Amino acid sequence: MWVFFINFAKNLEDSKFHDIILGKWSEHMKKNKTNISKLLLTLAIALFLGIATYFNIDLEGLLNSSNAYNKINYTASFDLTTIPKFENEPYVVLNDNKPDFNEEDFARDTFEDYSPLDYLGRCGPAFAKVGIETMPTEERGAINSVKPSGWQTVKYDIVEGKYLYNRCHLIGYQLTAENANEKNLITGTRYMNVQGMLPFENMVAEYVRTTKNHVLYRVTPIFENDNLVASGVEIEAQSVENKGEGICFNVYVYNVQPGIDINYKNGESTLN
């Protein structure tokens, strides 16, 4: 960073640059305080942009990171406080099981949209029009290089497979062939992954393979405040060609593991 300021100081020694800056400053000093404030703000912005450019800072990412969901123009249509407390069922139905897609979604050609990670490194919604053409043609590869927000490697004997957390695909690999995509992987319990999400993924995959039709499929991770681990995910799906006669659901899947208490702030856990 010092190199940048040294170069900036050297530029000030250049007579033309020096005269311009001093001239502008002198001119504005003669005006009222509002104009002086505007000049200071302009100089501050220029300096900030210069530093950002010099150090290759992703300004767009910083500006958009507080709400990555806007990238695919969707936020969950419910308040987390309205979701019933987990009662040994992996999911609850939302909005009378009706997804919240619009006509533009149905009209789009086959697509896959993944939100950029937000300023905490968290995933946003993942949205796709699933069809035979989006499904994998090879076995899934390794995904252990991805460390989703809140990731903890911890084992419990009461968990099938021992590991509490899985790297959960928002849109399952069998639907869109996305492997180690950090924008499509969250920290999820084994229970949510296998008991909660997988049955819905299998339902959609079987429908697409059997009918060769398409399905709109969107998964939205629900984070409370600045928690790094999602409280759950909203899964919406609707068959395209018959407007939901084949597949139609909207559910909230709990990111829980029976017998274990989870700190959603950072992913830490204890036996309850």
Name each model-derived stretch.
Residues 59-110:
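N-terminal, intrinsically disordered, polar/charged segments of Gram-positive cell-envelope systems
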